[in-house]
């Protein structure tokens, strides 16, 4: 890969992939509004233990979405001993009753579409296209060494650790940064770029969700490349080999002895398509290794990967190609 496209890809990721500060702040405001609504509207007998930021917003791997369709995960946990029925006050509330209680507390006359109960959460909609998913947890033996949590789901209460992925991811980033400066930051950028690639053709491609892509990126990321163009190429290369061996994805945040499968089978349609699209991408990028590869060929190859709508062409025009350099 003789011609570097590191600066252009970093600029593209910062401008067109990563969330802007303005969008992030707006999402946080909506999250805080929901939290305030819950505090004000929940029954007095019910005591909140914590609000729990989850998902890609919490670990800073969220990307810009067409139409502003952002999905924020923000859980709420309750002291289990306070989740008692309103009339008798003796029986434990069921998972359905807790989700209904949370849904009612989140309702607001200002909403054009009121919150709805889903399998494992309550969803709050916003006119800008955003939605906030609010899962509910009960905390048993709170503030003791035996503390554990259960998620309110459609099938009842289920053991769950809502901060497990957050902790695992932050530890992974910190470990990478200790080994090599900015390796953790590059890891985050690679996840966001992989998500952008997966969503670059919209509904034309059937792609796995962000959690599966994050777990695959963790398996396939190599920290030895300072350049983001090389790092992403080898992420795709390693991912292609990984999917050739197996298309099953595991939750790597869990202990190895008890990991849950995130896929349903070896041949989930979205995993099969991901493998094919990664293979296609590597074929497009083969030209980068040619001795006679030109700057325009490099630009066109990367534009095919991310479907940038002319961003790289504009970037090169503004910078007169000064970001390119020969690589040893």
Give the positions of each predicted feature.
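N-terminal regions immediately upstream of nucleotidyltransferase
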Residues: 1-69, 78-95
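Terminal (often C-terminal) interaction modules
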Residues: 1-13, 250-328
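Soluble secreted/lumenal catalytic domains
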Residues: 18, 189, 208, 212, ...
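Conserved catalytic core of two-metal-ion nucleotidyltransferases
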Residues: 22-25, 38, 42, 59, ...
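Extended, alpha-helix-rich binding/interface surfaces that flank or overlap catalytic cores
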Residues: 63, 130-192, 324, 328
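Glycine- and aspartate-rich repeat motifs characteristic of hemolysin/RTX-like Ca2+-binding segments
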Residues: 73
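Conserved nucleotidyltransferase catalytic core and NTase-mimicking acidic/glycine-rich helix/loop elements
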Residues: 182, 186-293
């Amino acid at each position: 890969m003789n011609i570097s496209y590191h600066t252009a890809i970093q600029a593209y990721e910062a401008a067109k992939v990563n969330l802007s500060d303005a969008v992030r702040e707006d999402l946080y405001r909506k999250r805080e509004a929901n939290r305030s609504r819950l505090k004000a509207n929940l029954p007095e007998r019910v005591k909140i233990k914590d609000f729990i930021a989850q998902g890609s917003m919490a670990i800073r791997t969220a990307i810009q979405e067409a139409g502003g369709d952002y999905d924020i995960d923000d859980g709420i946990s309750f002291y289990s001993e306070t989740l008692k029925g309103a009339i008798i006050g003796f029986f434990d509330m069921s998972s359905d009753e807790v989700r209904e209680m949370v849904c009612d507390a989140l309702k607001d006359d200002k909403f054009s579409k009121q919150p709805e109960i889903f399998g494992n959460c309550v969803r709050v909609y916003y006119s800008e296209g955003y939605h906030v998913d609010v899962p509910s947890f009960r905390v048993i033996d709170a503030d003791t060494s035996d503390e554990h949590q259960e998620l309110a789901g459609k099938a009842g209460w289920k053991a769950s650790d809502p901060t497990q992925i957050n902790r695992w991811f932050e530890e992974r980033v910190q470990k990478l940064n200790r080994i090599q400066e900015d390796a953790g930051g590059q890891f985050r950028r690679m996840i966001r770029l992989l998500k952008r690639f997966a969503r670059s053709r919209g509904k034309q491609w059937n792609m796995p969700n962000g959690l599966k892509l994050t777990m695959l990126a963790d398996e396939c990321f190599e920290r030895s490349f300072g350049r983001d163009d090389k790092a992403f190429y080898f992420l795709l290369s390693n991912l292609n080999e990984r999917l050739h061996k197996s298309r099953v994805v595991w939750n790597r945040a869990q202990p190895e002895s008890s990991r849950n499968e995130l896929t349903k089978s070896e041949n989930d349609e979205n995993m099969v398509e991901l493998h094919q699209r990664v293979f296609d991408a590597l074929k497009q990028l083969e030209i980068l290794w040619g001795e006679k590869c030109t700057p325009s060929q490099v630009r066109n190859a990367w534009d095919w990967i991310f479907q940038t709508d002319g961003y790289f062409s504009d970037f090169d025009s503004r910078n007169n190609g000064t970001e390119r350099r020969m690589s040893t």
